[in-house]
UniProtKB/Swiss-Prot annotation:
GO CC, alphabetical: extracellular region
Cell compartment(s), UniProt: Secreted
GO molecular function: toxin activity
UniProt entry tagged with the keyword Secreted: yes
Main location group: secreted
Stated name of the protein: Short cationic peptide-1a
The keyword Amino-acid biosynthesis appears for this protein: no
Tissues expressing this chain: Expressed by the venom gland.
InterPro entries: Cupiennin
Organism: Cupiennius salei (American wandering spider)
Amino acid sequence: FLAKKVAKTVAKQAAKQGAKYVVNKQME
């Protein structure tokens, strides 16, 4: 089902953003 695929893509993007946020926090 398409919605499931979209949800998975969104989750992957969110994880990528979250990882970037964590790295930026550790850099400070």
